[in-house]
């Protein structure tokens, strides 16, 4: 078990060494589009995907996200119980994306999507069946009750509102609720951090829904858990009143709550002690400190999406 514990520490160190962080992000901001592509291909995207990269931005975005998922799913073999379930649910946000894409194809028609996100512990790994009906999807999900209900409730919402957007909205909200429910089974410190993270996710969604998808305020507020004690309602009103998307994103990214959450040194009080005790042989064999893992998974998620936004900006500059 001690060797397993050492492997977990080694994995975290190796992934942090290769991962994205504030310094690398600032460096990438100074590069042109081609420079960012080359850096990510050589340093972040997994070797097995590098030869599959195409020139278009969509391919790059896909393999950046897929590499993130494959790397972070490696932690699941070292985690147990509620901790393992929480990280798995966190990563399965992309399974919710897969399900929404499949349902869009079934409802609206079109070609079956080729680039779904398949990673160890995903609902569909290693291959997605060729679904053609809702019943086929529900049958496939019969052992995954939470995700089966997401599809059922999302489809009911689509039929009631007669607009596909509301299917996705319902499924996204149900995934967030599932993540929050799973966080309640964790240490209270972690639950509080998740609540703060969710409060910022709601505001980011408000920016996306209002400024990108052009939904009205009623639709935006329907997604948000207004009972979240850490929700900054003043910031929410500010981003909804922003004149454009860029201003809304800047308001969100520069907000005190988001900056504090991003910079929160979760390791100073826990993981440093964890590593010291491991060296002295005083730690229970097989234990892995959860907060550094969650911090890494969360921060990589943030920097991945920030980088993709940066790539899209660089493409626009070159047009």
PLM regions with names:
Residues 1-319:
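N-terminal domain-start signal
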């Amino acid at each position: 078990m001690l060797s397993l514990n050492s492997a977990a520490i080694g994995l975290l160190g190796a992934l942090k060494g290769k991962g994205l962080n504030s310094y690398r992000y600032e460096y990438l901001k100074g590069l042109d589009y081609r420079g960012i592509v080359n850096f990510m291909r050589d340093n972040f995207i997994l070797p097995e995907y590098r030869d599959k990269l195409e020139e278009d931005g969509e391919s790059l975005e896909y393999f950046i996200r897929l590499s993130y998922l494959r790397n972070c799913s490696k932690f699941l073999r070292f985690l147990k119980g509620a901790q393992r379930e929480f990280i798995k649910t966190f990563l399965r946000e992309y399974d919710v994306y897969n399900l929404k894409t499949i349902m869009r194809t079934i409802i609206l028609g079109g070609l079956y999507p080729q680039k779904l996100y398949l990673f160890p512990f995903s609902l569909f790994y290693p291959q997605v069946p060729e679904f053609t009906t809702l019943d086929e999807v529900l049958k496939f999900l019969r052992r995954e009750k939470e995700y089966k209900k997401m599809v059922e409730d999302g489809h009911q919402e689509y039929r009631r509102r007669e607009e596909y957007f509301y299917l996705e909205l319902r499924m996204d909200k149900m995934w967030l609720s599932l993540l929050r429910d799973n966080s309640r089974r964790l240490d209270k410190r972690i639950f509080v951090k998740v609540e703060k993270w969710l409060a910022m996710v709601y505001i980011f969604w408000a920016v996306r829904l209002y400024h990108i998808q052009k939904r009205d305020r009623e639709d935006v507020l329907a997604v948000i858990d207004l009972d979240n004690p850490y929700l900054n309602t003043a910031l929410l009103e500010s981003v909804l009143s922003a004149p454009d998307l860029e201003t809304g994103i800047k308001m969100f990214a520069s907000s005190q709550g988001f900056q504090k959450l991003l910079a929160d040194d979760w390791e100073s009080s826990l993981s440093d002690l964890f590593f010291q005790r491991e060296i002295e042989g005083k730690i229970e064999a097989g234990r892995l400190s959860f907060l550094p893992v969650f911090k890494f998974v969360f921060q990589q998620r943030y920097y991945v999406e920030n980088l993709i936004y940066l790539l899209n900006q660089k493409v626009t500059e070159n047009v």
